[in-house]
From Swiss-Prot:
Residue intervals passing through the bilayer: none
Database matches in Gene3D superfamilies: Aspartate Aminotransferase, domain 1, Type I PLP-dependent aspartate aminotransferase-like (Major domain)
Cellular localization per UniProt: Cytoplasm
Annotated keywords: Cytoplasm, Isomerase, Porphyrin biosynthesis, Pyridoxal phosphate
Name under which the protein is recorded: Glutamate-1-semialdehyde 2,1-aminomutase
SUPFAM superfamilies: PLP-dependent transferases
Any one Gene Ontology cellular component term annotated for this protein: cytoplasm
Amino acid sequence: MSNSHTLFEAAQAHIPGGVNSPVRAFKGVGGDPVFFESAKGAYLTDADGKQYIDYVASWGPAILGHTHPDVIKAVQTQAEKGLSFGAPTEIETTMADMVCDLIPSMDMVRMVSSGTEATMTAIRLARGYTGRDKIVKFEGCYHGHSDSLLVKAGSGALTLGVPSSPGVPACLAQETLTLTHNDSEEVKKVFSEIGDQIACIIVEPVAGNMNCIPPEDGFLETLREVCDESGAVLIFDEVMCGFRVGLTGAQGRYNITPDLTTFGKVIGGGMPVGAFGGKKEVMQHIAPLGPVYQAGTLSGNPIAMTAGLKTLELISKPGFFEELEAKTTKLVNGLQKAADEAGIAFTTNQVGAMFGFFFSEEKDIRRFSQVAKGNMEQFKAFYHGMLDEGIYLAPSAFEAGFVSSAHTDQDIDDTIAAAKKVMATL
């Protein structure tokens, strides 16, 4: 019996399901979750002392790998000065300046403590700014677990949304329209009929919660156009893809300017953090400048700001993202070749240092319905095979993978070799 199994059994006594976030429970792949004790660079070490090459990266933040010495040193220095003050600090301003310098669409930014808090508040701000209630989201995109966003589509594009979780009031869900991701025509149709009632569109410009799904040509442009025509606010949820697919995020990569953007993950350097920001015209409606309320005890926490600032400084160095993307391409191509040699129906997607793979006959996967049709049994078998080989992937067929600057060419080669071995058994 493994130490992870023993720890999981003990955890379930007082933690619901034994985990503090559902995907960690391994329900998507079966078996016990792995409990980790330490991490360094591209490697995780579990409670039994086994090492794994890590492609989960704490679900995205660890773009530099784990325990980067410069980040650790900066955090230790700040910790000696104080963990939290509940008052303004200079580093909050320094961090805000850097984010706004890197992201041209951001005139102002507000720091919060999680991605969910960022998206929740961005939607509240859009509603307050426009005086409208309805919002548009897309099937397969995840924007945290606030009530307005735990909604699935009704029977048609204009049908009232229905809650996707108990505890979400139907009256709130009715204000959320869930449309087909990457379907420009459906977006145009909805806006032609009720565009003057819609406060905002929120979208992951690179969807990372139905694996890794890039935008189809013209999709993001359509969102910008209908928002301009209707007066709705365009929100890019870059909590996952921001500072991951490039230094200027997905909006820089695809040259689309949103009105508001949400960030998280990478900008905290491994600490809990979120942020939302955008055009001054919109942001000046947030308290204390305006009437739209938002507050947080740990917003702008100096430890999180320190870790995030150091991370942004390091990833801003010339050539960082080019090297990271090249590593990711090598990995993705190697996985595809391993599957092809084994005669396995397999497809990969990549945007920058984000990647995804699908056990599927389809070769151009751009929508949630395509992801859901994948061979989940093959995915589970592949997942556990790779785990046995010391490769830690996301324990869900609906989550993206991440490469860090700590991954070496040898790490990539070892991962591809493991994939060849496992693919041959499927």
